[in-house]
Amino acid sequence: MSQSICSTGLRWLWLVVVVLIIDLGSKYLILQNFALGDTVPLFPSLNLHYARNYGAAFSFLADSGGWQRWFFAGIAIGISVILVVMMYRSKATQKLNNIAYALIIGGALGNLFDRLWHGFVVDMIDFYVGDWHFATFNLADTAICVGAALIVLEGFLPSKAKKQ
């Protein structure tokens, strides 16, 4: 039986486009205005800092010889396809899950674009306290983490709230 795309979770794919535009736009601005390693303080404990990540989160496998570029690209494609299928199978009214899936897809595709186009992921957000700096990250990473947090949150909600 065929169903209208608007009645499925695919109705939320617009959010993927929004995440991609914001993520790729921010990376473009960094690439056009920063040299590698440049830092600009924004607020206490927050800098813009241009870094290249050849690995995954926390530069995992960054110095592994190049194969990891294709490995992480494959993971991003696989997860995106799985989440699109899950969105298709869910109802548009299941907002929390569909928003979470769209955020994760948008973030995964933003970093996938970087890997395929540049050979690395552009990172620029440097959060720090005193001399301690968290791993530099980007808006795609933020979207993925917020999406994952929403999925966890959804698991704690009562059944009635999950259906909406």
UniProtKB/Swiss-Prot annotation:
Any idea what job this protein has? Answer: This protein specifically catalyzes the removal of signal peptides from prolipoproteins.
Family named by the database record: Belongs to the peptidase A8 family.
GO-annotated molecular function: aspartic-type endopeptidase activity
Q: Where in the cell is it found?
A: Cell inner membrane
Active site (UniProt):
123, 141
According to its UniProt record, this protein's enzyme class is hydrolase
**Which BP terms from GO are recorded?**
proteolysis
> Taxonomically, which superkingdom?
Bacteria
Reaction it catalyzes: Release of signal peptides from bacterial membrane prolipoproteins. Hydrolyzes -Xaa-Yaa-Zaa-|-(S,diacylglyceryl)Cys-, in which Xaa is hydrophobic (preferably Leu), and Yaa (Ala or Ser) and Zaa (Gly or Ala) have small, neutral side chains
The topology of this chain with respect to the membrane is: Multi-pass membrane protein
Which PROSITE patterns does UniProt cross-reference here?
SPASE_II (PS00855)
What GO CC annotations are associated with the protein?
plasma membrane
Native source species: Escherichia fergusonii (strain ATCC 35469 / DSM 13698 / CCUG 18766 / IAM 14443 / JCM 21226 / LMG 7866 / NBRC 102419 / NCTC 12128 / CDC 0568-73)
- Name of the molecule in the record: Lipoprotein signal peptidase
Biological pathway: Protein modification; lipoprotein biosynthesis (signal peptide cleavage)
What are the alphabetically sorted keywords of the record?
Answer: Aspartyl protease, Cell inner membrane, Cell membrane, Hydrolase, Membrane, Protease, Transmembrane, Transmembrane helix
Please name the HAMAP family in this protein's record.
LspA
Supply the EC number(s).
3.4.23.36
> Which parts of the chain span the membrane according to its record?
12-32, 70-90, 102-122, 137-157
